Amino acid sequence: MQVTFLGTSSGVPTLNRNVSAMVLKPPQRSELWLFDCGEGTQHQFIRSNLKLSQIKKIFITHMHGDHIYGLPGLLASIGLAGSSSGIELYGPAPLKNFIDSCLYNSSSRLAYSLKFHRVENAANNKEILFEDSELEVKTAPLKHRIPSFAYRVNQKTRPGRFDIEKAKSKGIPPGPVYADLQRGEEVRLEDGRIFSGKEFCGPPRPGVSMVYCTDTVYTESAIEISRKADLLIHESTYSYKETEMAYERGHSTATMAAQIAAKANVDQLILTHLSPRYTPGNQTCPNDLLNEAKAIFPNTQLAKDFLQIDINKS
């Protein structure tokens, strides 16, 4: 599982940071999941090694402009390319009206299906938002000036590694039967012999997990959805010096993000959604936010546009 940051600034873009967007590449799939879509996100795709045509799911955290203004144009561009087989869009209830209105008033027609999923019920009732045989997505309400939601992607436990040489030594011919054995199933060969997949597989391999948490001030629900995640991506709009402003505006300081990471017992924290006031040369710069967080949670990294992170078990 890999994440790529396409926008790491809050509110407005800067010379080096675009507004919020992050891409998840699920393991062993030729598809991309986009989290938030601030203005200019499709330009960031062009500058990266990612393809718009591979987007299959889009998750929007909340309805502030720096998280959604890039979405209508991105959807229209995908339609013009004519290469999408359909997109699933997840977000707060007003998102559907926003997209429908933008497309209608610009006379834009999508050449693919766009299916919208409201997230409020899943968030408030702690239900699974999406699930297939390999992945599941959960969501939780955050604490912001308007309704805002965190997302967690869990990779399910996978079968242990298949010992091909052992299977060959037993005279099991290569082919589809290997896939059955790898799934732990029992198989019968043409000669009547029966084998259990458990004989040829190592211990089950736990999947990895990623949590995307923005915009929010410190809240227990952020801790709950982040518990024991391999990677927590959390907003860090302000320094601890602006704690009062953070509470007033519904944002987190680097200290708050680190406290959430520590209490949730995550493996790694990445800070994103930095206020444009923190630029190199100013009284407070991004590295100050990083050091602030690392004093509480040492395994912290600062996001920057086009940073790619592979999520692995520690």
Swiss-Prot record:
Gene3D superfamilies the record matches: Ribonuclease Z/Hydroxyacylglutathione hydrolase-like
Amino acids binding Zn(2+) 2: 66-67, 215, 273
EC numbers on record: 3.1.26.11
EC top class named in words: hydrolase
Domain of life: Bacteria
Keyword terms: Endonuclease, Hydrolase, Metal-binding, Nuclease, tRNA processing, Zinc
Annotated SUPFAM superfamilies: Metallo-hydrolase/oxidoreductase (SSF56281)
Bound cofactor: record note: Binds 2 Zn(2+) ions.
Active site: 66
Residue ranges crossing the lipid bilayer per the database entry: none
Subunit structure: Homodimer.
Name assigned to this protein: Ribonuclease Z
